[in-house]
């Protein structure tokens, strides 16, 4: 019973975040600030969301999903997706399918290395995330594309190792 209550609360929090997004969607984000068009989801919560309860409940037409709590982050200079993230990706696939989204996978890096190298590394990360989504069952027609932002859109400072780790990430842009 406690798990059902927790799942219901998490589902409601997700809906609240989506509705908050809908209200603030008209604003254009700037580089280092947290983007207002981003739905940040704690991955532990995302693993437990009952996707069927979210279907058709004010799901926005466009939203960017970033899984927080140091999830789907990459090691320095790596484009490999850790198997511990596969469950989270399966739930993302279900969310995409239930809400009839298409996804653009966007790769990001920290600021170490040249801009040219980081753009290529970000693209490899996005391509590997796309490949894993397809391997885990997402239909190819649900993939809108892959992009790299390299080091151009940090979410944390690049002056510390902790900040750089947060910047090495994947974002999923969902569009209806």
Predicted feature locations:
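Hydrophobic helical h-region of N-terminal Sec-dependent signal peptides
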Residues: 10-18
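Structural recognition of the beta-strand scaffold that forms the well-ordered cores
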Residues: 66, 73, 104, 145, ...
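Bacterial N-terminal signal peptides that target proteins for export
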Residues: 2-9
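Generic marker of residues within folded, mature protein domains
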Residues: 15, 55, 64, 93-95, ...
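Periplasmic peptidoglycan-binding/tethering modules of Gram-negative envelope proteins
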Residues: 26-101
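Glycine/serine-rich loop-strand microenvironments at binding/catalytic pocket rims
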Residues: 86-119, 175
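Sec/Tat signal peptide C-region and signal peptidase I cleavage site
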Residues: 20-24
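Periplasmic OmpA-like peptidoglycan-binding domain that tethers envelope proteins to the cell wall
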Residues: 108-176
